[in-house]
Amino acid sequence: AIVHDVMPVFELFQPTTVDDTLALLDTYGADAWVLAGGLDTFDWFKDRNKRRKVVVDLSGVESLRGVKKAADGGLEIGASTTLTDVANDPLVKQNYRLLSQAAALVASPQIRNQGTLGGNVSQDTRCWYYRSGWTCYRAGGNICYADTPTAINREHAIFDANRCVAV
């Protein structure tokens, strides 16, 4: 039986430097989960077989937050920078208006205030079937349950897909 909404036991580390973070990730490897905003993390922990022995919380690593002009004239945005900060940053607004506008349109204000750029770039698939433990293509199976006539597929891009239609 699948038990939902049960938070697994894990050890929490809260490094304050990138070097300490990398050392923890090197030590624990695949047993570690990186936490930034956490919007996706706890759903995965409660509702699927994603279990990690260690959670590395990046919230104390100041150097991973913020926006600054890069040496080459481009832009550097830290992985722990919230989407609200990206949307409202003067450098982004002035030089990368489309990025500012896009960040301002993601989800709700609450999610933009908590969600990070790194987390949004690296979040896992939103497919209801995949997240519920079905043995679909993405989970190693041989079928995409979202791409069937009776599927619950509201969150999927089902146009011109060849295997997995999840986004």
Segment roles from a protein language model:
Residues A1-V167:
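C-terminal structural segment of proteins
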